[in-house]
Amino acid sequence: MTNSSNNSNKCENKNYYEILKVSIDADIEEIKKSYRKLALLYHPDKLNKEENIEENINNFSNCLVNNNNNNNNSNTKDFNDIQIAWETLKDDLLRKQYDSLLLEQKRQKYSVSDEIDLDDMEFIEENSEYVYPCRCGDHYIITEDQLSEGSDVVCCSGCSLSIKVIYQME
């Protein structure tokens, strides 16, 4: 059990989509392509030894001061995060469960400042998204895909406010 909690702690500041550098609505091919690229960059067996030597020399004084020589551990940690993210997002069921978890975390993290009816939001057909102005001058944006996945809490892109979008599934 300790191992699984360690895995979740590794990725605690970034979600799996951020780790794989894809959007939350990315398709499996896009996710796979990004995973492969990142795996090649961070896999411990694929790392360029000369780059590691040069990096270790550059970080030598920091290691002495901090008594912390975990450069390789950082690369291994990055690769492990990438692997965990891929294993979750490549499986449809695990991805849906993970997306639900992200949504629940988002709801708990952000207190809802207002409830807005979807009909009051402007629909931007080009991006298939709904937009609503925030009092800070920026906007709340939610896509049709997010709505169909059950997402209803939207954070402003410019401040810490969030709204709950009221709508009925058709």
Curated annotation (Swiss-Prot):
- Could you say which protein family the record assigns here? Belongs to the DPH4 family.
Q: Which SMART domains has this protein been placed in?
A: DnaJ
Originating organism: Dictyostelium discoideum
Q: Which cysteines are joined by disulfide bonds?
A: none
Instruction: Tell me which UniProt keywords the record has, alphabetically.
Output: Iron, Metal-binding, Zinc
Recorded GO molecular functions are:
metal ion binding
**Which positions does UniProt annotate for Zn(2+) binding?**
C134, C136, C156, C159
User: Which InterPro entries does the record match to this protein?
Assistant: DnaJ_domain, DnaJ_domain_CS, DPH_MB_dom, DPH_MB_sf, J_dom_sf
Q: Which GO terms describe its biological process?
A: protein histidyl modification to diphthamide
Q: What is known of its domains?
A: The DPH-type metal-binding (MB) domain can bind either zinc or iron ions.
Q: Which CDD domains match?
A: DnaJ
- Which residue numbers delimit the DPH-type MB domain? 112-168
The residue ranges of the J domain are: 15-102
- Write out the function statement from the record: Stimulates the ATPase activity of several Hsp70-type chaperones. Plays a role in the diphthamide biosynthesis, a post-translational modification of histidine which occurs in translation elongation factor 2.
Tell me the superkingdom of the source. Answer: Eukaryota
Q: What is this protein called?
A: DPH4 homolog
One matching Pfam family is DnaJ
